[in-house]
Curated annotation (Swiss-Prot):
Pfam name, any one: RUBC_PIKBD
Name used for this protein in its record: Protein associated with UVRAG as autophagy enhancer
GO BP annotations listed: autophagosome maturation; autophagosome-lysosome fusion; lipid metabolic process; regulation of glycogen metabolic process; regulation of lipid metabolic process
Gene Ontology MF terms in the entry: phosphatidylinositol-3-phosphate binding; phosphatidylinositol-4-phosphate binding; phosphatidylinositol-5-phosphate binding
Biased composition (Polar residues): 131-146, 157-173
Source organism: Mus musculus (Mouse)
InterPro entries the UniProt entry points to: Autophagy_HostDef_Reg (IPR052428), RH_dom (IPR025258), RUBC_PIKBD (IPR048569)
Localization annotation: Cytoplasmic vesicle, Autophagosome membrane
Gene: Rubcnl
GO cellular component: autophagosome membrane; cytoplasmic vesicle
UniProt topology in membrane: Peripheral membrane protein
Superkingdom of the organism of origin: Eukaryota
PTM-bearing positions, type N6-acetyllysine: K469, K509, K519, K559, K619
Amino acid sequence: MVSQSIGWGDSPVDLCEGSNRAFQDTDQPACQLDVRLLRHKASWINPLCVQQPLQELCPQRPTVQSSENHVVLDTPSPLRLSILSYRDSLAEMPLSENTADVICSNSAHCSGGKEGDFFLATEEQEVHLQQESLLKNPKTVATSPSPKEGSARSESPHLTASTDDGDARSSSRSHAWNFFPLETFMLPADVEKENLHFYAADIIISVIENMKCNLPNQQQPERWDTEDASRLRGTGAEMTFYTHIKQEPGSSASSHTGCEGCAALQVSPVAETLSYCPVAGEACKHDLNKLVMLELGKYNDITKGCRCSYNSSKSATCESNLSPAGCLARELFRGFCKCWMLSEVNCQLPGSPTTASSGVGDEEYAEEDFDSSVDAAREVMLKSRVPGTEDWVLPRCQIILTVHPPIKRDIAVVAQNFFCAGCGTPIQPKFVKRLRYCEYLGKYFCASCHSSAESCIPARILTMWDFRKYQVSDFSKWLLDSVWHQPVFKLLGGHHSLYAKAKELDRVKDLQEQLFHIKKLLKTCRFADSVLKEFEQVPSHLTDECHIFSMDDFLRTKKGLLAPLLKDILRASLAHVDSCELCQGKGFICEFCQSTTVIFPFQTTTCRRCAACRACFHKQCFQSSRCPRCARIIARRQHLESLPTAAT
């Protein structure tokens, strides 16, 4: 592996004492690796305060650069001692154990003086080399030396240090390390910033590896032990989320998914381990979504019988007169009930007493459980209530205009077949007294469908003008609130007698008739825009049609709020008609008395309209048998019939 380091010319000079020692080959074990060689890209910058003492105290020595096969020495120069910048002396060199030992031994054996002068750059050359390094490729600057340096260097095939005087080497090296301050061996801020991405990459990689290690442990459920696995093989059933992996020597592990419920596991003396299979888990979830009822191969015939009965019931249901929604609800209900009851056979825990028993006992228990489940499913289906059946019908949104006669609770519940009228829940006879009566529907509801809400009953208002509030079910409360402001009550038919019982309603009826006729007249006048805006104070159905009211209109009439408002609108309309020439020109003249006073249809107190020709006359003058306008219409029709046709 290749690591990056700097030339020995840039490193601090070790102050060594003693006689000069030549470099020679030796088999002595390598010395301790220098800490500076352990870094990926190390560089040392001596502060200015240390450079001057180094020029005076440090001896001259060659700069050593080693590779796998050779070591490069920088020849000396008689220039002033100076420390080269780390930017100009960076060099790439492959490190190995031998070369690292050689470099360490060389640094320990070095001495000054008699070996020769070293190549040292002056401060001016330092600045010049730094400027040139900015213009060059960093990789080129780091790997290729300058021509001058190349000419001054010589290569030697092998460079080793002698093994003598080990104590002297250690003492000189410790003296050299203690001489420099701690700031000398600290990396500058620029180098730390350059190496910041290495630290970030290491942190990210460690976090990702921890997540990969913890993720399978979180997803994998609790495994069964070997004893539970053997019990599971005895029962002949398999859990879908696990696979059996047989580990045999000399053979690859083979897996059996177990998605097929009828497949029996092979028992072998080789130890088997249970492992989680994501493919099998997805297949099992897919099967559960499709409502797989039973996966025991031994009960295929029973399952087929259940499917046949289910298909027959399905066809019978579809042939009935139920709505598509009701038919679908019934089919889904039956399918869910059958799936829920039959799935209990497959959901037996491996550590239960049933699975721990013999295989024959398990089969008998499964058969009994299956039969009881089928019977229970049939019983639930028979007792279940689905909207549209004969014994229970869901309440419908309808307006009931008749008052229900009083009836005993027991008789009413029997008429409901002991079912709640709202949800169809079966009611036992001992709980009949807990049911609540709905005055609107005239039926009994359970506590979940009847929260004792109160509302006015439309039938009691139309028949007895009764605005008292009675308890109704939640469904009836919602229905009455939804139609409270809708004009759905017409009093012209069977409830016309209500005008005689409610005098205030009769006055509202008269005002409504006048406003109905005068509004038609005002719509034809182009000067009646301001008056028509007054009609917006009341609902439009009160002035567009007669004898049509809503529940809110009845209540406001009962409180005396509607009649004064209608009178104000009528007063403003009459004032406009009296002063408007266009409206006066659209009035009538009584043909019986030949009076010049203009009369209008909205004057219901003094005028009357002919039912045939819709002409307006005074009440005391009008005679239906002698209507002059009807007589003219009949005479004109007879005259047209007596005229000869164009063909004759």
